[in-house]
């Protein structure tokens, strides 16, 4: 179960004197939206407005102004580099799952030096897993990410700097969490094995096959885009995905290499939103996972920034890197 911290939310609404509050949840938690809304309204008297738009992370924070007095954002931690708004409350929805020591039998293949990673919901399990690994004679390290990362060991779909910070000191990474989205960021970004420990099922698996399958698709997209003459550079208007400087630089690079280049600004990047543009290929400067994970949905090559640089000859195929959204500020 995930902790919705309803008592803390009630106290925050009452202390702030908010008469209306927007409620933003990721897709996996929206099944609880009615229950949470009912509880908060009955406990505070505030009008609760559920945000129905898809929510992909704290990078996709809803602009509540003009709709409500405040916002409660569920399922993600703050992105420190985006600044602080006292009228926004983050509820990380931590899991109460535990890891049984018997899981160590499935981790026998781990090398001596291991880096630990997790999504925000399972960060609380890092100390216990670290203790189990150290008891087995291994060294377990937890890295610290850049200013997009709120907690040590945390991985976002667009940022694996917590892994990067300890990469030279470990031989493999163990990710604690569910699904492929977050561990793939580490698998793409690090040239080292990444294993996933699912704390709900106890399953342990490698990301190598999934990573390699997606990378083969990426190289195919790069090859297809090599024949393109016209490109649409996509800039996203979401606050946490808006890389305007990178988009402008990419337009200039394409034109310097004799390509026709245009820039479009979109809130939501979908096949439908790009269908009308008569270009040969797209360069995405928003969340890199749009290109990497969803490329099969688009009828033309969709590239990340480093992939476009390979097409232009500014980067070699051997120099392929994961397009992280970073922040050192």
Place the predicted regions along the sequence by residue.
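Peripheral docking tails and interdomain loops at the edges
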Residues: 94, 200-212, 288-329
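Redox- and metal-dependent alpha/beta enzyme cores, enriched for Fe-S-associated oxidoreductases
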Residues: 181-260, 268-276
